[in-house]
C-alpha cells in the first residue's frame, strides 16, 4: 500500500489553496497609490480610536 497518489492529490490541493489566498490578498481595487494610502490611514485611525475607547472604558 503506497500513499503516493494521496500525497500528490494533497500537494495539488494545497497549491490551489495557496494560489487562491494570494489572489484574494492582492486584489486590485482600482485606486491609485495615494488614494489607497489615504484610505488605509483613515481605517487605521478608526481602529486606533476604537482601541483607545475600549482601553479607557471603566471596568
UniProtKB/Swiss-Prot annotation:
A GO BP entry: protein destabilization
Comp. bias regions, Basic and acidic residues: 1-30, 50-59
Superkingdom field: Eukaryota
Pfam families according to UniProt: SERF-like_N
InterPro entries xrefs: SERF-like_N, SERF1/2-like
Function: Positive regulator of amyloid protein aggregation and proteotoxicity. Induces conformational changes in amyloid proteins, such as HTT, driving them into compact formations preceding the formation of aggregates.
Family the UniProt entry places it in: Belongs to the SERF family.
Protein name: Small EDRK-rich factor 2
